[in-house]
Amino acid sequence: DIYCSHEALVVDYERAMLRLGQDPAGETALYDLSAHEVWIGERTRGIDDFHVNLAALISNPVGLKIGPSTTPEEAVAYVEKLDPDVADDAPGHVKGYKGRPGRLTLVSRMGYDQIRTVLPPIVEAVEATGHKVIWQCDPMHGNTFTSSNGYKTRDFDRVIDEVQGFFEVHRAIGSHPGGIHIELTGEDVTE
């Protein structure tokens, strides 16, 4: 099986891809057919803006990028909006969990120099809510710089250091690191 994910960025495109269907419990649910999972980028994640409201409405799994400006309180507010509590007898509910396991992925993009200080209080605050989000690390976007020739690039050692820091944070807290988030293409990329 192949599963795809993409940033739910273009409003008109995402609206055109909305369809009603049945969820695994047979209930009518709204889905975004543009991908199996859609995610919201760091710059479009206003909690009351279109992108977050769309993600709250659909039944797809959703991801949310969080950066170094994200506070623990903001992270908790996103979790409560995007993975709200459900009744114990609700279809798809798993006893002992708030929300729906697998519904929400928080993708940290902190940068190698901030991951070890900014991420721990966010993870601790979210874990304290009882929600079981998937934690991922995007080590590319927080480590971008412009080279002397004007191209955006990344230093591989910094990318690896951010990934290592991500796993160190989760090991120290006792939370589960769900993996890394890498955008890719089969083409050469110059930004």
List each model region and its residues.
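Non-transmembrane, aqueous-exposed alpha-helical and coiled segments at domain scale
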Residues: 105-106, 110-137, 141-189
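Active-site-facing alpha/beta catalytic cores
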Residues: 1-111, 151-154, 162-163, 176-183, ...
